[in-house]
């Protein structure tokens, strides 16, 4: 009988232990108060954008929203102009974009993103990005039912395209975790030097052979880390939370590998007094917030999010988590770990609708903890508001 098999028994016990751990862990709740900053406390200003969904056409629509959503990339250009003005008045330390930079990972979309970014060099020097499911897992913009075969080079092409784009943005400032030494290694730029010819050949030919040889490259690139400038400074740990999917209907699934979680431990040991932003695309657990439809609750949180929450517990008073994915504006905490979910400054309605994003200020609060001060909301007026003015 199958239920008498030792593997079946072991699986049942493991599932029971997992459920007990999930039930016993702290539950997410809204952030009831913000930290206060002493005069001697250090502060870091972080602009948090997410899900900007850049399209490759001037009047292009998005996969998710179609004709009921925004067109083109004017809203992103407006956000960058606002950031440039904010930075000139009160300097920022970081502009963090937590995934879904593009709408479908196409080369034209990446080109449009860089076309906007290059107009604001001061902001470009502050930007750190990470991949979202739309950058990697959208098989076909026009046909959600289309499959990517596991051996298809198209998925690898989207991965390589993303890595190349991230290197252009932050190649000199982030370092790659070395699994052999269990310490931070070379910069992203240096790590890719020996693969440049191979990447260029794959981009030209798209062969399965080159796709296989580049398979490990994507895996070993995460986490990327911008280390703190001082022993007790602020560092940024960039995770890849995207599951390896081959079907558009499952493209939103997320998971953080155990290798990345172990790397976080080693990085924290290397910088024991540092503060951290842990940045990823997907939200860790379901939050205590109402949704309009059931589909928003299905398959969008991390598959192993509760496990990762428990794992990050060791960083709770020295870290905050920042993410995007569902375009939800939420600030809360779970077991002492502050979590910030970013709204999308682009999505959420047509170009007539107003959108917004936040500039957060992190501080060295009482007791040496990392605190979150009240955020600065930056409004982006829609065309309707602009006409009214």
Language-model region placement:
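Active-site environment of divalent metal-dependent phosphoester hydrolases
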Residues: 53-58, 103-105, 133-141, 244-247, ...
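A short C-terminal boundary segment appended to hydrolase-like catalytic domains
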Residues: 362-389
